[in-house]
Amino acid sequence: CITYGSQCFREHNDLGFGIIGYEDALRVSSNTFFYQVGYGVGVDEIHKVSRKLGFNSLSGIEISEQENIGLVASSEWAKEGRGWGQPGRTPWVPEDIASMSIGQFVVQVTPIQIARAYAAIANGGYLVTPYLVKKDEENLSDKKLIKIDIDSNNIQLIKSGLRKVVESGTGVSINYGVSNLPPVSGKTGTAEDGEGGLDHAWFVCFTPSEK
């Protein structure tokens, strides 16, 4: 396990995966890999990039008055009281960054936010403003596209890792019993509900993988 603050953070399989790179870390959903990445870049860098991908903000859909902006925490948020405490009494602690790095505890996102972020990875770096339609539409106005300042090599690396998730990783079961399935890229997500509780899980994907 890896210790941050007073807590020991383990791999979800209790054994670890040895030395792996980014793509395989996505494929096997390695917690300890991303603990180290998150701790290395820091909370405020994670917060900054998350804003680029549409988190911590409304999506722009026509029913935005019913949206929740969610939460991707920052050191300033902790310093100001975490939304419930007194300013200066709830500073950022090392345990926060570990949990944040795998999307837990101080991270709360909505389905439409995660869909926008994955769409931006799929389309090469454009954040799309979703809107409601009555029928299929072929054209998308440029006004609904925002180019994100993210290195194209990093986008390709993420796409490759997401494809591996479905080919041989935690999302491989999507292939079972389905014929003529186009290439799918995606990622599992799991949140625990206390000791003994059932996990909450979802799977986010896009297809075809290379278009």
Positions of PLM-derived features:
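Beta-lactam-recognizing serine transpeptidase/beta-lactamase-like catalytic domain environment
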Residues: 1-211
